[in-house]
Amino acid sequence: MEGKPLLTSKQKTAVVCGVPTQVVCTAFSSHILVVVTQLGKMGTLVSLEPSSVTSDVGKPVLTTKVLLGKDEPLVHVFAKNLVAFVSQEAGNRAVLLALATKDKSMEAVKALQEVIQACQVW
């Protein structure tokens, strides 16, 4: 039986704000897994689930939940800013984000978004 592979995965290495960074994106049937590391490990695992749209805004709200690692407010903000576009572009699928970064500035978020976009599997 030929057809679409069960898993689609892409990876890219780039220098983000002077730090070597690896990004791996893998598409599963119900989730997109995004691994972003500058430390060579998976780090904090965050689940981003889209909620149902109840207003005329049109975009679902992403609910974040730290599954593994430090559950700090900055982690939730960073995760939403980093991968909200992945969920939207993937038809509002849930995203699992594994995050181990040194730099959590907005400059780093924008640069990391470009690397994630280059690994598009959705």
UniProtKB/Swiss-Prot annotation:
One of its GO terms (biological process) is proteasome assembly. Belongs to the PSMG3 family. It comes from the Eukaryota. Disulfide bonds: none annotated. Homodimer. Interacts with PSMG4. Interacts directly with alpha and beta subunits of the 20S proteasome but dissociates before the formation of half-proteasomes, probably upon recruitment of POMP. GO terms for molecular function: molecular adaptor activity; protein-containing complex binding. GO terms for cellular component: protein-containing complex. Keywords: Acetylation, Chaperone. The modification N-acetylmethionine is found at M1. PANTHER family: PROTEASOME ASSEMBLY CHAPERONE 3. Chaperone protein which promotes assembly of the 20S proteasome. May cooperate with PSMG1-PSMG2 heterodimers to orchestrate the correct assembly of proteasomes. This is Proteasome assembly chaperone 3.
